[in-house]
């Protein structure tokens, strides 16, 4: 769902044409899971907005045990009780967005006083036995990312991802654009981060295709070279069941509805096929930054 208890400066969903649709109920989401299983889709990520705002989250995770399951969250509602329930429902991993080890910086970027709750949520998830990672969208305000990694390690986190700012939603507004790192600045941040992560025994991945050349990322020692997976390795379902190319691609391209259209029709949709063909080139680009987005939306 896209309801949220934060107002992040770089939110990919905020202000999007499909950002205010009506949510499916519990029974409908369970039907979605059945259809995804029938299509042999191996992994489901519960994301948002903020998925922990749904009272049926544990029930849905429990219904999704056939899949590899992941939860993307800001962590603020990960109480000891909810963390334990998610663990018992066989949630495979949880990714918490942590912008900074500094409360003032984190709070400025999420638009609310949420740092304490997020840190508590990370601690609770770790204590419950969940596999926990942090994700950090990088910008000029939190470029001291190495400190955030040190802090996360002190909380018991051993996995981290970071990204550039996806040009979608609020991240296209003047306030967000003003904080974007240049390629050289991003390279400097990643160089320090890779070194610190290695010293802490953490696994670190950079997940944004197209921000830096492949040779630069390999030279930094990053093991994952990101490439666009839209309509190829991942797709997304909006709160009303509409299928879109990826969770950030909410500007008007719709590929069908998972509850009313057969999966084969969605998968073979001409728009889906065109986007997938671009993804399959493995050119390490983000299609939200290329002309293919405009062509698909035309």
Please state what every model-predicted region is:
Residues 1-93:
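Conserved alpha-helical substructure of the radical SAM core
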Residues 2-5, 222, 280:
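Processing junctions and N-termini across compartments
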Residues 3, 7, 227, 285:
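The −1 position to Zn-ligating cysteines in a subset of zinc-ribbon hairpins
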Residues 4, 46, 96, 241, ...:
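Conserved, mostly hydrophobic/aromatic
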Residues 6, 13, 233, 248, ...:
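Short Cys/His-rich local motifs and their 1-3 flanking residues in nucleic-acid-associated proteins
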Residues 19, 88, 99, 104-227, ...:
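Radical SAM enzyme [4Fe-4S]-AdoMet core and its adjacent flexible, acidic
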Residues 218, 225, 242-298:
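Flexible mid-to-C-terminal extensions adjoining Fe-S/redox cofactors in radical SAM and related proteins
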């Amino acid at each position: 769902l896209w309801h949220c208890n934060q107002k992040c400066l770089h939110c990919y969903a905020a202000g999007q044409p499909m950002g205010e649709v009506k949510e499916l109920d519990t029974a409908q989401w369970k039907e979605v899971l059945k259809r995804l299983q029938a299509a042999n889709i191996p992994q489901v990520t519960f994301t948002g907005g903020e998925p922990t705002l749904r009272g049926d989250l544990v029930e849905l995770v429990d219904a999704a045990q056939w899949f590899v399951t992941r939860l993307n969250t800001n962590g603020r509602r990960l109480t000891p009780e909810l963390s334990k329930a998610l663990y018992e429902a066989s949630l495979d991993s949880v990714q918490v967005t942590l912008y900074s080890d500094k409360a003032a910086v984190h709070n400025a970027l999420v638009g609310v006083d949420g740092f304490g709750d997020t840190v508590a949520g990370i601690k609770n998830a770790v204590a419950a036995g969940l596999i926990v990672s942090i994700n950090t969208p990088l910008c000029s305000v939190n470029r001291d990312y190495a400190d955030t990694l040190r802090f996360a390690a002190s909380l018991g986190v051993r996995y981290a991802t970071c990204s550039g700012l996806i040009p979608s939603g609020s991240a296209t507004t003047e306030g967000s654009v003003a904080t974007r790192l240049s390629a050289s600045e991003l390279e400097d941040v990643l160089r320090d981060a890779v070194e610190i992560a290695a010293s802490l025994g953490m696994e670190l991945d950079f997940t944004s295709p197209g921000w830096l050349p492949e040779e630069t990322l390999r030279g930094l020692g990053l093991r994952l070279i990101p490439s666009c997976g839209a309509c190829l390795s991942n797709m997304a379902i909006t709160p009303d069941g509409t299928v879109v190319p990826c969770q950030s691609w909410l500007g008007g391209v719709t590929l069908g509805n998972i509850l009313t259209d057969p999966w084969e029709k969605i998968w073979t949709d001409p728009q889906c096929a065109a986007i997938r063909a671009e993804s399959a080139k493995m050119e390490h680009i983000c299609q939200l930054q290329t002309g293919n987005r405009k062509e698909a939306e035309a």
